[in-house]
């Protein structure tokens, strides 16, 4: 590390800073810090338990009402309908798309190719 021109003058203060930092870290007591004392009971400390009492039954009722949605019957019906609507004829559609894409690409390539290199289309 190259020190700037003023580096030689700041080197003693940098060393002092490092020594003080090492001393502070070394003098820290080892182990876990003591926990903070419990806060006094106030109205605000009762808020989480009150919210849990109000929201808990609501969540339970909602979970019970929507249980049918997460069951295997609803999901199986959705997957079957999706397959019938979108995936049943995917193989033939994909094959037709690949064939038409290949034909379009060949026609475009032959249209760009000069006659001297590719020959006449009528000779094929």
From Swiss-Prot:
One of its GO terms (cellular component) is high-density lipoprotein particle. Residues 1-27 form the signal peptide. May participate in lipoprotein metabolism. It is found in: Secreted. Belongs to the apolipoprotein C4 family. Blood plasma, associated primarily with VLDL and HDL. Expressed mainly in the liver. Its main location: secreted. PANTHER family: APOLIPOPROTEIN C-IV. This is Apolipoprotein C-IV. Glycosylated; contains sialic acid. Present in up to five sialylated isoforms. InterPro entries: APOC4. Keywords: Glycoprotein, HDL, Lipid transport, Secreted, Signal, Transport, VLDL. GO terms for biological process: lipid transport; positive regulation of triglyceride storage; triglyceride homeostasis.
């Amino acid at each position: 590390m190259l020190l700037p021109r003023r580096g030689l003058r700041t080197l003693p203060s940098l060393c002092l800073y490092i020594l003080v930092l090492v001393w502070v870290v070394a003098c820290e007591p080892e182990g876990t810090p003591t926990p903070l004392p419990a806060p006094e009971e106030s109205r605000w400390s009762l808020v989480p338990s009150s919210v849990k009492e109000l929201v808990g039954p609501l969540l339970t009722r909602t979970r019970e009402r929507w249980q049918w949605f997460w069951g295997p019957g609803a999901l199986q019906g959705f997957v079957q309908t999706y397959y019938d609507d979108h995936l049943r004829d995917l193989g033939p559609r994909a094959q037709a798309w690949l064939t038409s894409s290949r034909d379009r690409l060949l026609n475009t390539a032959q249209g760009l190719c000069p006659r001297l290199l590719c020959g006449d289309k009528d000779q094929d």
